[in-house]
Amino acid sequence: MKLVQTAIPDVVVIEPAVFADSRGWFMESFNEQRFHAELAKLGLPVPRAFVQDNHSFSHKGVLRGLHYQLPPHPQGKLVRVVRGAALDVAVDIRKGSPTLGQWVAVELTATNQRMLWIPEGFAHGFMALEDSTEFLYKTTDYYAKDCERCIA
């Protein structure tokens, strides 16, 4: 697992180690111990434990987001595409942050197998670039309807 900081250093691309041979391929899609160790090497805080996994299916051109949750239920998200492709976007909405209002976009595909770590305090969204795109994300807090917000 290799972590690469984006233009907003707290948002990190995760490139998993993929082992391929004539039978196909294998990868660890998540390893908490390694994830935390790699974040620490970058001087980034370790997130709260993941408590919910979500799975979405989108047709090409569908835009989802930009969503976030207010305290006391902010969500950090670890996201990936398992089928198709998406342009994934994180916008810094943290008050007092030196990167407040800045955004990063990363193409996540089933082929490149990258993931994106988006900490609490960011609005998040994506657009499906291919038909039948399936998107998985782990969150550090449960969905809380009363705390959910959207930037349209």
Per-segment meaning from a language model:
Residues 1-111, 130-132, 139-152:
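Non-catalytic, conserved peripheral segments adjacent to functional cores
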Residues 108-130:
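Conserved metal-binding segment of the jelly-roll/cupin
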Residues 123, 135-138:
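A short beta-strand-loop-alpha-helix capping motif that often carries His-Thr
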